[in-house]
Amino acid sequence: MEFKEGLTFDDVLLVPKYSDITSRSQTNLSTKLSRNISINIPFVSANMDTVTESSMAVAMARAGGIGIIHRFLTIEEQANEVLKVKRSGSVMIENPYSISSEKSIKDALDYAEDKEISGLLVVDSNSKLVGIVTERDLLFANSNGSISDIMTKDVVTAKPGVALDEAKQILHQHRIEKLPIVDDSGIIKGLITSKDITNNADFPNASKDKKGSPLVGAAVGVKGDFLERTESLLEAGTDVLVVDIAHGHSENAISAIKNIKKAFPDCELIAGNIATAQGTEDLIKAGVDAVKVGVGSGSICITRVITGSGVPQLTAVMDCAKIGNDYGIPIISDGGTRTSGDATKALASGASSVMVGSMLGGTDESPGTVLTKNGKRFKVYRGMASLAASIGRKSKETGSFSFDDDLNDYVAEGVEAMVPYKGTVVDILKQLSG
């Protein structure tokens, strides 16, 4: 058996050297997330069910990074989370939500609540714009009434191609918050809102796609419905997919990568997790656009304890980055990042970006409710190979969970914990970015 030295973040320090930078404002943190996607800060929120859904992904994109929506949702739910992110920051919303004028007020209330929006465009049987209903219209209205009775019928609109400055002028002139974009035949082509214009100005460093919408990623598995899930996520506007499996250097992962790339050759694909140079090369040859590195290094991951397998994270990143550089494929360091210094070391050792989980768990934007214990506030944070996460997945997939049957077949490689409530993720990202 051959033994080699392996280093983790705590084993090294960066040697200070001369710098000609006189202000932090002179630094540029932009980097490659994958072969064809760049982000403005090198941070990615982990695809974990206690870290990233739409709220976290929106915050990450606004700060200049990107969030990866976890896959432990139904296909429809996960695609809807992607849509929420895409609609949160686009100057013009394509395919805005609309409802038939024949529907009831209750239908409108239920639809608006489900989509988490404050207003709806109203269309006739020919899909032409006939009105608009807002929160104020729906407030205290008789739920049995018709939308056509309460909607605003004289709707101010603009033509496709309207300039942003002109749209702002129209919104101000008419004291309205929503401006439907309608063609000559009355068909809706988009929607501009005052909130989206404000967000666009407030977050100049935001990570955006070519259409100006926030960047967002989503995870898929390697078995079952992964191709169907991939198709739905891409249709929803997902910018990058992450093939998510604990041991990425495996036949299951490589087969899934090849199948996804064959069915969707233009999709941007990240895969992992791996921890060796050979694993990196095999995934790259299978067709990935970035490789996620880290086995057992996460704060709530016990893979190394249970399986005796893993590579210290700094060494793993260095080994994998050498291969990534040869092929021009970015490396994402995933795991072991407990401080901003750890992130710096990961980048210095060859990673293009850093996936963070534990640092973001417990924030306002992470899924879950705030719990109070002994006068202190906490949120749940768990590894995706933990028993609790497995129970949650099994229950979603089958609608039930048998403690006698299912527990006998499962070996946990992660744990669940309560982490202190941390407030908004914005402050953490500022600390990470310096």
Labelled PLM ranges:
Residues 1-18, 22-25, 100, 159, ...:
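Alpha/beta catalytic cores of nucleotide-metabolism and tRNA/nucleoside-modifying enzymes
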Residues 23-40, 46-48, 77-115, 122-124, ...:
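Bateman/CBS regulatory modules and CBS-like beta-alpha motifs in cytosolic regions of diverse proteins
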Residues 25, 74-83, 187-207, 225-228, ...:
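Active-site-adjacent beta->alpha loops and helix N-cap segments on the catalytic face
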Residues 38-44, 91-96, 209-219, 260-275, ...:
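Short beta-strand/loop segments at the ligand-binding rim of alpha/beta enzyme cores
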Residues 54-57, 108-109, 147, 167-168, ...:
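Generic hydrophobic/aromatic pocket-lining and core-packing "Φ" positions
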Residues 55-58, 228-236, 275-293, 333, ...:
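Catalytic cores of alpha/beta
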Residues 62-77, 184, 238-250, 289-307, ...:
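Glycine-rich phosphate-binding active-site loops on the catalytic face of alpha/beta enzymes
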Residues 69-72, 98-99, 119-121, 157-159, ...:
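Catalytic beta/alpha-barrel core
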